[in-house]
C-alpha cells in the first residue's frame, strides 16, 4: 500500500497556453475546494460536473483567476480516489500561484507519474496499461500511437491473462495431486496438465515472436545512407524528408559531417543519417567524415547503399559492398532516369530498388522496402493488433517460457510433483512481473519516474 495523503501537481506543459490544469487527488479534495473555490451559487460540488467560479486566497481574499472546476468522486476517477481538477488561464505565473495555494491547504506536490501509480496501486489499471500511457504521450507516429492505445485498452493484458490462466489451471491440478496423494494420478490428468502448459507456451512464443516488430513501431529504427561521393545520398535524404536539408552540389565530397533527421515512413519512425561519401582521400577533414560514416554503418538497423546507375560499377562500389556484407542493407540504384551503364553483382536476398531523386520515380517502392525490412506482419493496421514492445516485458515473458519448458522436461522425466509445482510457480511469478502483480517496489519506482509530474 501507499501513504494515502492528498497530492497535487500541474498537469499541463509549462509556459503560455489557452488553459492550465492543476490536478489534485486524495481524501481532502472537497475541503480544499471549499477553502479556495468560490462561485455564485451555494451547495456542494457534484461528481463529474463542471463549475464556473474563482480561486480566492482565503488569507488575502485576492482573486487569483477565473476558473472551471470539476470534482470526480472515487472510485470513478483516474486514480480511483477523489479527484479535483482546476482549469485556469494557461500562463506560467497564474498556474503556479494556484498550485502554491493548493499546496498551502495541506497537500503534497506529486512525484513523477504518481497519479498513474495510484491508479495502478488502486487496481484501475495493471502495469502494462500504466506503461502504455507514457507511450501514448510520447508516440510520434500513427502506428506507434495505435500500438500504445491497444496496450492501454488492455489488449496485451488480455493475451497475458490467457497465458496466466493456463499456468494457474496446470498448477491447480498438480497441487491437487500433491494434496490428495491417496488418489492415483491418472494419465488423463497428466495429459490435461500438459495441454494447459502447451497452450500457454504457444501464446508466449507468439507474443515473443512479435517483440522485434513491436519495439520497432515503438522506438523506431536508424537508417544510414551510404555510398561513394556524388551518387545522390544527400538528394535522397532531401527527397525522403520532402525538404532541402542537405547541400547538394556536383562537387564530390560536399557532405563531410553526419546529417541526422527523423522522418515517418509508412507509420515507422526512422532516424536517417546522411554520411560522407566513402572513398580514398588526401583531405584530412574529409577523411574524418569518412571514418564517421564507416563507424555508423555496423550499428545501423538498415543501410541504404546508394549507387549511381548511370556509371559503371566501380572498385569503390565493391569496397563499400564488402563493408556491408554482414549488415542489413538495400541497394538503391539512383539516377534511373538516365540510361543504366552497369550490371550489379549477384546479391541473393538483397532488395535492389531503382530510383530517381530528380523525378521521384521509385521512391514509393523504396519506402515500401524500408518498411518491409522491419515489419512482416500485415496485421499491424488491424484494430486488434497488439505486440510486446518493451524489453522489460520480453525479458519477463522469456523467463516464464523457460520455466514452462523446464516443467515440460521435468514432467517427461518423471520428476517429483513438488519440483514440478516450483517450475509452474516460477512461470507464474514471471508473468506477474509484466502486469505488476509480483513486480519489486524499486522496479515500480523506476517505471513511474519515467512519467512527467502531473500524470
From Swiss-Prot:
GO BP: any one term: tRNA wobble uridine modification
CDD domains xref list: trmE, TrmE_N
An MF annotation (GO) of this entry: GTP binding
Localisation per UniProt entry: Cytoplasm
Binding locations of GTP: 230-235, 249-255, 274-277
Details of cofactor binding: Binds 1 potassium ion per subunit.
Main location: cytoplasm
Keywords in alphabetical order: Cytoplasm, GTP-binding, Hydrolase, Magnesium, Metal-binding, Nucleotide-binding, Potassium, tRNA processing
Superkingdom, taxonomy of origin: Bacteria
Signal peptide start-end: none
Keyword Cytoplasm assigned: yes
UniProt GO cellular component terms: cytosol
Binding-site list for K(+): 230, 249, 251, 254
Record flagged with keyword Thylakoid: no
Major enzyme class: hydrolase
Function: Exhibits a very high intrinsic GTPase hydrolysis rate. Involved in the addition of a carboxymethylaminomethyl (cmnm) group at the wobble position (U34) of certain tRNAs, forming tRNA-cmnm(5)s(2)U34.
Record HAMAP family: GTPase_MnmE
Assembly and oligomerization: Homodimer. Heterotetramer of two MnmE and two MnmG subunits.
Protein name per Swiss-Prot or TrEMBL: tRNA modification GTPase MnmE
Species whose genome carries this gene: Geotalea uraniireducens (strain Rf4) (Geobacter uraniireducens)
